[in-house]
Amino acid sequence: MNLAISIALLLTVLQVSRGQKVTSLTACLVDQSLRLDCRHENTSSSPIQYEFSLTRETKKHVLFGTVGVPEHTYRSRTNFTSKYNMKVLYLSAFTSKDEGTYTCALHHSGHSPPISSQNVTVLRDKLVKCEGISLLAQNTSWLLLLLLSLSLLQATDFMSL
């Protein structure tokens, strides 16, 4: 009986870990805020447990998430939004003191080791502005619609009028 329970538990864990994966983590600057876009897959029925953290000088600082307790110094500076396959964290008043390696990690539940994570090293003077990234990287449907509309208008000779 114990063997059957162990096998069932192992299969459940394998199924969940296969269905939850961080696909990318990007960083950019919006005004004076750092924006972290954590894109992920979730093909399992289990809810996603996640954590954003900063490692600076070998010390890990939890910023936000459902795993771990965010440090007091970051609580008032973070703003979080979530979509189906993306978690977005804003860190306001970003300065060179906030430079380091940022991590987005997915967990099974509680304080278990992460099943998937991505890192990005952030340096203030190397950050790009988000405006150029967000239009194309987050929502390309409007661009596709515009291109198709222009082709349709050109095909109907509307452009030559």
From Swiss-Prot:
Residue numbers covered by the propeptide annotation in the UniProt entry: 131-161
Any single GO CC term annotated in Swiss-Prot or TrEMBL for this entry: membrane raft
Pfam family, one: ig
Span of the signal peptide: 1-19
Modified residues (Phosphoserine): S82
InterPro entries: Ig-like_dom, Ig-like_dom_sf, Ig-like_fold, Ig_V-set, Immunoglobulin_dom, THY1
Positions of modified residues (Pyrrolidone carboxylic acid): Q20
Keyword Transferase (UniProt): no
Glycosylation positions in this chain: N42, N79, N119, N139
Domain Ig-like V-type: 20-126
Membrane protein topology class: Lipid-anchor; GPI-anchor
Annotated GO biological process: angiogenesis; cell-cell adhesion; cell-cell signaling; cytoskeleton organization; focal adhesion assembly; heterotypic cell-cell adhesion; integrin-mediated signaling pathway; negative regulation of axonogenesis
Lipid anchor positions (GPI-anchor amidated cysteine): C130
Chain's role: May play a role in cell-cell or cell-ligand interactions during synaptogenesis and other events in the brain.
Protein name: Thy-1 membrane glycoprotein
Gene: THY1
